[in-house]
Design a protein with these regions (language model features):
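C-terminal structural segment of proteins
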Residues: 1-127
Length: 127
């Protein structure tokens, strides 16, 4: 069971960084990976209001925010054209669309789960 004592919706990345300096703090995303274990969280830091849920294409790169849902990777036409569909294939077998709408890129990478096709794809892309 996940137990949260204090909830803070960060107003800036700087505030989130400062709050996250304590070991008892935890950054929240889609929360699907956090639910996998028992944990007591003193301060939960919500990043959902910081605009980190987008995929932006520049001349040099694709910029993918940490709060971007996995389903957005699956459906982003330009990103999938660039990777010849590899991004779409790396996420399409992850549970279901509802789950992929909640699970985030940041949580999938930060969790370093051995079963993570997302992490493997980003490693293969040398990101």
């Amino acid at each position: 069971m996940l137990k949260i004592k204090n909830y803070v919706k960060a107003e800036s990345l700087e505030q989130a960084y400062e709050l996250n300096q304590k070991r008892t703090a935890c950054v929240l995303g889609g929360m699907v990976w956090l639910k996998m274990g028992n944990r007591n969280i003193m301060t939960a830091i919500d990043l959902s209001g910081l605009g980190l849920d987008t995929i932006t294409e520049t001349e040099e790169a694709f910029v993918i925010g940490c709060m971007t849902p996995l389903h957005a990777l699956e459906t982003h036409k330009e990103l999938n054209a660039y990777t010849n569909g590899a991004i779409r294939e790396s996420v399409r077998h992850i549970v279901g669309v509802q789950f992929r709408n909640c699970a985030t890129v940041g949580g999938s990478i930060f969790g370093r789960f051995g079963f993570s096709d997302v992490l493997t794809m980003f490693l293969a892309l040398d990101t």
